[in-house]
Every structure is written in structure tokens, then in C-alpha cells.
From Swiss-Prot:
The gene is PCDHGA3. Residues 805-841, 902-932 are annotated as: Disordered. PANTHER family: CADHERIN-87A, PROTOCADHERIN GAMMA-A3. It comes from Homo sapiens. Residues 1-29 form the signal peptide. Residues 30-133, 134-242, 243-347, 348-452, 453-562, 570-682 form the Cadherin domain. Keywords: Calcium, Cell adhesion, Cell membrane, Glycoprotein, Membrane, Repeat, Signal, Transmembrane, Transmembrane helix. This is Protocadherin gamma-A3.
Length: 932
């Protein structure tokens, strides 16, 4: 007996040990905690570090963290204490509704080992909700003939809590006619019913006020009240009855909104108002009323909102049928939602390494990927793979986790960046798939310096620019990446006119945009040479340079300056001499002006603005030569005043004026004597002088009117002949003003003396001068003159058509040419032809301008003449052959000197406006006139 017991005890002990071992092995990979709902954020849940066998400090070192699938994080890890704590306030009713056991599963990832531990946390319910009726008041109509013992169902209260904290009992306020009966069903729900204890008498009491109290079993106890108003009516002793107490229906989750599910039906054997049945949807269980709709008249149940199998797989709908007086009955509808493959797989990058060195080994971990599909069954089976022929592969980890690793060695010289595409497909029909992309950079070293696309750059900026204006932008490229390709720009330090280059321009170190730090002046300097350095941010940094030439463009910001006649300092006006015997075209003087600008801004034209004797003098449009327009008469005043305007061709044009005084006399003593004799004779008889002036004004007006008529007739006649010439095709084309630009950047002369010489023996033939009786104070536009000259030249050509000799260009006057010793340059050592053309280099131009300025100053002082000796270009004697032009600045580029193949001369014939003898035999003698 003892041996048997021992054998039996040993066998039982062995079975017990085996069972305990199995339980320990089963629970070794799962951790479970419990926590109450509505705890504050950071409340303790469990010591996760201890349960994982780790120290708290190892949580951060080994990358221990919580991973979840798209759900809001309810818990977090405390790295200091190694505890699992709440991440926010948890509401069990929102999380699990009325499920008795509320479990939340989370995954703990140990990243260094790529291990995942599953943790289950039970959310315990607390009594934080009171029972609540769907309405605060209920009206029940009962016939007075209703027999005692009749039961009247009452709307139930709803408490979202579970267990003892849920709804436990109902209590009715004390009264003489009604009592409360509570029915319990298998699911544990309690349905209150109002029981009539004694017959009602409407004549005694028509309305009864009752209060129904619903209480839960929590601590403290919560309760809710329903105010019941009983109205006594005539008899209605039959409530509506459903055809079946429970309806079942299945529906696919993707059915459209508005789809009819089924139609419920309830009947009432009463008649009239007592038999009118209406259907009511019980709104207590959460959001059922938002998803389903019950027609109160027909009993048709339809869908109000799209169904989702992943949100809810099953719905229980409670409905009521109520007749007219208020009797009702209950039924329920069970809706099963069927799954369809409407969810594509979800790919979550749990851990990612964005860059790897090119010398990395095979099998290096790049990313940890979680793949999940919310569908069920075959629709939730997922496969994942790498797209394309890339040196990467996926390795299966635990659960639905995969590791992305390198399959071969990487070579940055071939590919510096990989765009890895992952595709996950489920097993549904048709299958759904999802793609995600991972960008992987291969780490490089700084082995490439920045490079510019061009060897050098040229930039242009107009002068008088605002400070801070953007000038130019340079861009360099670096094939490296990250800091090795981050380029900064700088200017190499240098000086310009004694000032540091950084005071003129600056460069944005990030964008390479150059800015002007001051306003540039074309007359001060015309170009800057810069050296831009581009450096990367590698270690060590690499750099390269590029040259930038900055050219300043001229603007018309300088008005013409009058060199001759020079403005006196004592307030007096210089006097020019014109002999009485001067013929038309006699050169009285010449206005010399310069413009500090260049190009078109320095092209000068001359206009006669005002004259004391209109029609007596004319001014060359481009030469500034003041000549007599007609022969001097005895009636002409001894003293003539002229106002000459000099205007450049800039936009807008700038101008300057000078006043000339011309004395009509052969010598200075004569003009002094004549002016002295005129003083006393001007006063004797003012009345006779007034009469003479009136008669003179009338005569001049008549002459002017006749002159205008004759002039119009001549112009019409010439225009008619020019049209005939153009029609026949045998005429010579007019020679317009030149619009070519010279090699030194200055526009070519608009017209030349060679035109006059080649057309006629008379030097003034091609320049018809139209006397103006009245002069405005404004400048005559150049366009009006340019439009009139071709017509006049064409007429002269028509008149000379019969004589072929007149159409040949006269040879240039040799007196206008430079000898080898007189040529501007380094002591006349320059080589060139003997045509006397202007030198083209900038240095010689500046010397000639200074020479003209000095000569004009001497002429204003009376110490020299405009003529000078032969070969002096009409300047002072000290600028003759013995004085070269290499030491003086050149203003020639701003002085307008007409003539393409001739230069200034001292020949009397040319100065007086005489041309070489022509073929008409009317050779005129040159007057030997000199001027002061």
C-alpha cells in the first residue's frame, strides 16, 4: 500500500513539473501588465527594463523603443527608470467599448539585436460614467380600462462601463398606481417595465408623474433619472408585435451608401389610432444611428455611412415598434460585415540608414521594414520584394518585419545615389500593392575642386549706378556632395587707384552675385579686373579662380564745355572782327566745344539761337564755324551779338550756350573809332528813329512774305525734278549723314567737307541757308536738318548733271595734312599714310583735345590767332611742327571736326569758305582777311 502511494505521488510530481515547464516556456516571449484607465500622463505601468533583463541605462544604448502600426501611442518608455509609462490619458470606453476584457498589444524593439517583444496591457475599468437614459422625459399614454398587472416597457438606461461599474438596478419613485419590474436577459441586459397595480380612473386623475432612477454598482454609486409622464386614455390593450424577435443580415463592406438591408414589420390587433405603428431606432449603442437608418413608417433599414470591415465586423441594432397610444415592443437586427480586398498593404520604415560608405561590406543593414495589411484571410497575406536590378536584398525577420541589406559591394564612382523601390502585394483578387522609395547616399571624399563653366567673364554696368546694384552673377560647380560641394565665393584682394578693391565691389559668398558698393564714373575709370575665388567646404578645402572684367558704360551726364571763345573772368565779352568787304561764307570765328562723355553722348551739333541781325551769320551744324550768310551792308550795325548753342546727341540731350560779339571793321582802331562816334549820334532825334524803325519793320515783313513764297516754289520745283530723276534711274543718290561707328567707339562724322568739294565749285552750294526773320530760344532739332539736306543735295546734283567734271571729287587740300613731324604721337615718329586722317588710338585723341583747348584759350586772350602757321591745324604757333602732341591730353574724340580725308589747315581759302575752282569758270578770288 505504501509503495503504491509512493509510486502514485512520484508520478503526479513528474506530471506537475512537466506542466509548469510548458507554462514557463509559453510565457517567456510575452509580457503582460495591467493599468487602470484615466490615469495621468506618465503613470507607471511596468518595469520593462527588469522584465527584459536589462539595466535602465541600456534602453537608450541598445535602441529599445516602442513600435506600433498606425495607432496613436498610448504608452512610452522612461529611459531613466526603465519603466513603461502612459503617454496620454486612456479612455477604456473609447478604446474597447463594452468588451469585458480590454487588451492593448504593443511591440518593444531592441534595435541592436533586431528583436521584438510583444507586450499585452490590460486596461481596467473604473466607474467614470453614470447610467444615462436616451431622453430625460418619457410620455406614456394608458387607457383607463387597462386591467391591473399590465406591463409597459420603458426605455433602458445605458452605462458604457463594464462589470460592477455598469448598470445594476432600477428604482421607481413611490406612487399608488404603478410598480417597477426588471427583466434580465442572457446577455446581462436589464429591461425595466412599468406595471399597473390598480385600475386607473381618468375622472379622478388624468396625469401621473413618476421618476425612474437607474444606478450602477461602482464606488461611489452613479445614477441617472428618467421623468415619466403617464397620460390616462381610453383602452389600448395590445402593443405592436414584430414578425420575428431577431433579424439577421450579411453585407459586403464596400456597398454604397443608401443600400437597403432589410425591412422589419410589426402588427397591432387594435384599430384606429391604437393600431398606428411607428418604428424607432435605439440610439443607445454608440454610433449605430450614424451608420444605419430606420424608416419610421415603412420599417426599411438602410445604410447612412460607408462600412469598413477593419473598423467593425458586426453590428447589433435594437429597434422598437410603438403604436399610437405608446405601447411598444422590441426586436434586434444582427448585421455581419463581409471583408473585401479594399486595403493595400502598408509599408512602414521602422529604422533607416540614409548613407553608407562605399567601402561597406556585403550584408550591411540599411533599413528595418514593417509590412502590414488590414484585410483578413488571403487578402491580408503580403509579399514584399525589391524592384529593379539593384545590389540590395530583403531578409525575413520576426512577424512581418524585414531587413534591407546590401547584396554586393557599392562603388560610388559608378553610382553615387540609389533610389531603392520596395513593393508589397497582398493575396487578394485582384491583388493590391504598395510601393515605397528609399534614397541611399554613398559617402564620398573631397577630391574635386569647384569649376567655373567659363575661363573668364565680362560684365557691363552703366555709370552713375545706384549703390548696392547687382552687377553680375558667377556660378561654380562641384561634383562632390554635401559639405564637399558647398561653395563659397570671395574676391581676391587688390587695389584700384590707391583704394582697396573691396570698397568698389562686393560678392555674396553664398550666391556669387556681385554688387556695386559705390556709384561708378565712366570718366574716372572704365574697367575693373577682378579675380573671383570659389572654395568648397571640404576638409581640406579645394578652390579655383576665374577672372572677371567689369566694364563701365558711359551715360550722358556731362554737358558740352565751351573751349573757345573762353568765358572771360571780368564779365566782359570778347570781340571777333569781320571786315566790311567780307563776302558770303567768310569765316568769322569758330566755336570749339568738347564733351567729357564718349560715343553718341559726345557728338556735338551747333545752332544759332539768337542774333541781333537775323540772316547775317550762320553756324556750321557740325563744325561750329561762324560765317557770314550774305555780304555786309552799310546799314548793318557795327556791333553784332550772336548766341550759339552746342548740344550733344545723348538721351536726353544736354547743351551749353555762348554769346559772341562780332565787330564789323577791318582793324581794331577802326572799330574803336566807329563805336566812339556812334555814341552821341544815337540820341538827337528819337522821333525820326521811331519812324525809321516802323518803316523798316514793315519792309522786312513784306520781304519775308515774298521770300517764303519763292522758297516754297523752289522747293516744289526741286522736289518735282527729284521725282523725275528717281523715275528715270539716272540720277545720283543723295549722300546721307554717316551713321557708322569708328574704331575708337566714337560715331563717324555725320557729313564731311568732301561732299561740298565734290559737288560744286562753290563751297556753300550744298548748304542752302534759310534766313529766319524770327528766332526761337529753343534748339532746332537735328532731325529737321537731316531731313532737309538730302533734298537740297539732290537738286544740286540735278543742276550739275550735264557736267561730268563737277561730279568728280576734288582732291584734298594738301594744306590740311600733317607732315611726318606734325602727326600726333610720340614726337611724330608714328608711321602711316599721308592723307592726314586722325589717329585712332585713345592716347593721341586725348593729346589733340588738350591742344585744341590750349589754343582756344590763347585765342580768347588775344595772344594768338585762329590761323597760325601752315601745318598748325589752325591752332597756336606753339602747337606747330616744333611742338609735338605727345605730352598733352587728347580732347579730339569729343571735338567734332568734319571731313573724312582732311584735317584742320590754315589756308585762307578754306578758312574763308572758298572751294577749289570748278568747271563753270566762275572762279572767285579769295579775300586776304584775318581775324583776331
Amino acid at each position: 500500500m505504501t509503495n503504491c502511494l509512493s509510486f502514485r505521488n512520484g508520478r503526479g510530481l513528474a506530471l506537475l513539473c512537466a506542466l509548469l515547464g510548458t507554462l514557463c516556456e509559453t510565457g517567456s516571449g510575452q509580457i503582460r501588465y495591467s493599468v487602470s484607465e484615466e490615469l495621468d500622463k506618465g503613470s507607471f505601468v511596468g518595469n520593462i527594463a527588469n522584465d527584459l533583463g536589462l539595466e535602465p541605462r541600456e534602453l537608450a544604448e541598445r535602441g529599445v523603443r516602442i513600435v506600433s502600426r498606425g495607432r496613436t501611442q498610448l504608452f512610452s518608455l522612461n529611459p531613466q527608470s526603465g519603466s513603461l509609462v502612459t503617454a496620454e490619458r486612456i479612455d477604456r470606453e473609447e478604446l474597447c467599448a463594452q468588451i469585458p476584457l480590454c487588451l492593448v498589444k504593443i511591440n518593444i524593439l531592441v534595435e541592436d539585436k533586431l528583436k521584438i517583444f510583444e507586450v499585452e496591457i490590460e486596461i481596467k475599468d473604473i466607474n467614470d460614467n453614470a447610467p444615462n437614459f436616451p431622453t430625460e422625459e418619457l410620455e406614456i399614454k394608458i387607457g383607463e380600462l387597462t386591467v391591473p398587472g399590465t406591463r409597459f416597457p420603458i426605455k433602458t438606461a445605458f452605462d458604457p462601463d463594464v462589470g460592477i461599474n455598469s448598470l445594476q438596478n432600477y428604482k421607481l419613485s413611490p406612487n399608488d398606481y404603478f410598480s417597477l419590474a426588471v427583466n434580465s436577459v442572457s446577455e446581462g441586459a436589464k429591461y425595466p417595465e412599468l406595471v399597473l397595480e390598480r385600475a386607473l380612473d381618468r375622472e379622478k386623475k388624468e396625469i401621473h408623474q413618476l421618476v425612474l432612477v437607474a444606478s450602477d454598482g461602482g464606488d461611489p454609486v452613479h445614477s441617472g433619472n428618467l421623468h415619466i409622464q403617464v397620460i390616462v386614455l381610453d383602452a389600448n390593450d395590445n402593443p405592436p408585435m414584430f414578425t420575428q424577435p431577431e433579424y439577421r443580415v450579411s453585407v459586403w463592406e464596400n456597398v454604397p451608401v443608401g443600400t437597403r438591408l432589410l425591412t422589419v414589420n410589426a402588427t397591432d390587433p387594435d384599430e384606429g389610432f391604437n393600431a398606428q405603428v411607428s418604428y424607432i431606432l435605439d440610439k443607445m449603442p454608440g454610433k449605430i444611428a450614424e451608420i444605419f437608418h430606420l424608416n419610421s413608417v415603412s420599417g426599411e433599414v438602410s445604410i447612412l455611412k460607408s462600412l469598413d470591415y477593419e473598423d467593425a465586423m458586426f453590428y447589433e441594432i435594437k429597434i422598437e415598434a410603438q403604436d399610437g397610444p405608446g405601447l411598444l415592443s422590441r426586436a434586434k437586427i444582427l448585421v455581419t460585415v463581409l471583408d473585401v480586398n479594399d486595403n493595400a498593404p502598408e509599408i512602414t520604415i521602422t529604422s533607416l540608414t540614409s548613407s553608407v560608405p562605399e567601402e561597406g561590406t556585403v550584408g550591411r543593414e540599411i533599413a528595418l521594414i514593417d509590412v502590414h495589411d488590414r484585410d483578413s484571410g488571403q487578402n491580408g497575406q503580403v509579399e514584399v520584394f525589391v524592384l529593379g536590378n539593384l545590389p540590395f536584398k530583403l531578409e525575413k525577420s520576426i512577424d512581418q518585419y524585414y531587413r534591407l541589406v546590401t547584396a554586393t559591394s557599392l562603388d560610388r564612382e559608378q553610382i553615387s545615389e540609389y533610389n531603392i523601390s520596395l513593393r508589397a502585394s497582398d493575396g487578394g483578387s485582384p491583388p493590391l500593392s504598395t510601393e515605397t522609395h528609399i534614397t541611399l547616399h554613398v559617402i564620398d571624399i573631397n577630391d574635386n575642386p569647384p569649376t567655373f563653366p567659363h575661363l573668364s567673364y565680362s560684365a557691363y554696368i552703366p555709370e552713375n549706378n545706384p549703390r548696392g546694384a547687382s552687377i553680375f552673377s558667377v556660378t561654380a560647380q562641384d561634383p562632390d556632395s554635401n559639405n564637399n560641394a558647398r561653395i563659397t565665393y570671395a574676391l581676391t584682394e587688390d587695389t584700384l587707384q590707391g583704394a582697396p578693391l573691396s570698397s568698389f565691389v562686393s560678392i555674396n559668398s553664398n550666391t556669387g552675385v556681385l554688387y556695386a558698393l559705390r556709384s561708378f564714373d565712366y570718366e574716372q575709370f572704365r574697367d575693373l579686373k577682378l579675380l573671383v575665388t570659389a572654395s568648397d567646404s571640404g576638409n581640406p578645402p579645394l578652390s579655383s579662380n576665374v577672372s572677371l572684367n567689369l566694364f563701365v558704360l558711359d551715360q550722358n551726364d556731362n554737358a558740352p564745355e565751351i573751349l573757345y571763345p573762353a568765358l572771360p573772368t571780368d564779365g566782359s565779352t570778347g570781340v571777333e572782327l569781320a571786315p566790311r568787304s567780307a563776302e558770303p561764307g567768310y569765316l568769322v570765328t569758330k566755336v570749339v566745344a568738347v564733351d567729357r562723355d564718349s560715343g553718341q553722348n559726345a557728338w556735338l551739333s551747333y545752332r544759332l539761337l539768337k542774333a541781333s541781325e537775323p540772316g547775317l551769320f550762320s553756324v556750321g551744324l557740325h563744325t561750329g564755324e561762324v560765317r557770314t550768310a550774305r555780304a555786309l551792308l552799310d546799314r548793318d550795325a557795327l556791333k553784332q551779338s550772336l548766341v550759339v548753342a552746342v548740344q550733344d546727341h545723348g538721351q536726353p540731350p544736354l547743351s551749353a550756350t555762348v554769346t559772341l560779339t562780332v565787330a564789323v571793321a577791318d582793324r581794331i582802331p577802326d572799330i574803336l573809332a566807329d563805336l566812339g562816334s556812334l555814341e552821341p549820334s544815337a540820341k538827337p532825334n528819337d522821333s525820326d528813329l521811331t519812324l525809321y524803325l516802323v518803316v523798316a519793320v514793315a519792309a522786312v515783313s513784306c520781304v519775308f512774305l515774298a521770300f517764303v513764297i519763292v522758297l516754297l516754289a523752289l522747293r516744289l520745283r526741286r522736289w518735282h525734278k527729284s521725282r523725275l530723276l528717281q523715275a528715270s534711274g539716272g540720277g545720283l543718290a543723295s549722300t546721307p549723314g554717316s551713321h557708322f561707328v569708328g574704331a575708337d567707339g566714337v560715331r563717324a562724322f555725320l557729313q564731311t567737307y568732301s561732299h561740298e568739294v565734290s559737288l560744286t565749285a562753290d563751297s556753300r552750294k550744298s548748304h542752302l541757308i534759310f534766313p529766319q526773320p524770327n528766332y526761337a530760344d529753343t534748339l532746332i532739332s537735328q532731325e529737321s536738318c537731316e531731313k532737309s539736306e538730302p533734298l537740297l543735295i539732290t537738286q544740286d546734283l540735278l543742276e550739275m548733271k550735264g557736267d561730268s567734271n563737277l561730279l568728280q571729287q576734288a582732291p584734298p587740300n594738301t594744306d590740311w595734312r600733317f607732315s611726318q613731324a606734325q602727326r600726333p604721337g610720340t614726337s611724330g615718329s608714328q608711321n602711316g599714310d599721308d592723307t592726314g586722317t586722325w589717329p585712332n588710338n585713345q592716347f593721341d585723341t586725348e593729346m589733340l583735345q588738350a591742344m585744341i583747348l590750349a589754343s582756344a584759350s590763347e585765342a580768347a586772350d588775344g595772344s594768338s590767332t585762329l590761323g597760325g602757321g601752315a601745318g598748325t591745324m589752325g591752332l597756336s604757333a606753339r602747337y606747330g611742327p616744333q611742338f609735338t602732341l605727345q605730352h598733352v591730353p587728347d580732347y579730339r574724340q569729343n571735338v567734332y571736326i568734319p571731313g573724312s580725308n582732311a584735317t584742320l589747315t590754315n589756308a585762307a581759302g578754306k578758312r574763308d569758305g572758298k572751294a577749289p575752282a570748278g568747271g563753270n569758270g566762275n572762279k572767285k578770288k579769295s579775300g586776304k582777311k584775318e581775324k583776331k
